[in-house]
Amino acid sequence: MGTWDWQIFLQDTGGGRTYLEWMMSAWGWTMLVSVLALAIALVIGSLIGILRTTPSKALVLFGDAWTELFRNIPLLVQLFIWYHVIPRLFPALQAIPGIYLAVFGLGFFTSARIAEQVRAGIMALPKGQRYAGLAIGLTLPQTYRYVLLPMAFRIVIPPITSESMNIIKNSSVTFAVQVSELIFFALQSSEETSRPIEIYACVTALYFVSAFAVNRVMAVVEHRVQVPGMIGGK
């Protein structure tokens, strides 16, 4: 086993920056992709999850179809479809940078998982809450907004935390569509420097730090909004 050489991160890449600067830039792209994809996943996943609990059979069918479609196709395949197929079907999208297509692919994939969790959170509530909201004169949308969703979202914070951590880890797949994130950096720099141990050790540490930070932040949020007597509450 050779001696580890951490000074490689201070070496110039030949492009006017060091490998450390390149790695920090790649980390930034990883977090940007993750945050944008999570925002898409939360919005769409919440909407689909809500649709799957409505009295409308058509909306339930649409929500079920969305969930099964995006949940059962491998993430890498979905990214390739977004990157290679969609722009060919819709030429106007060819001008969109690949990173945004990757964000949509990752976001839609995760939305199916969040939809299932939101649906489960709503279904976990006592049925009397829905009936009580309607009985006092609230419309169905108002019942969801003021009665069901505030409770359901508190219940699903733990699984949403897991998905938030997973989306950071799943962003590593976007290297396959030329997103300059951490794995893309690791593959390129380890080949250039012939120091894969040092490179992958640091990349692994950055993934751990990112996911652990999300876990701790969400733990604080969960503690502040937990409902006594409900799942996760005391």
Question: Where on the chain are the PLM-derived regions?
Answer:
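Transmembrane alpha-helices and adjacent helix-loop boundaries
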Residues: 1-234
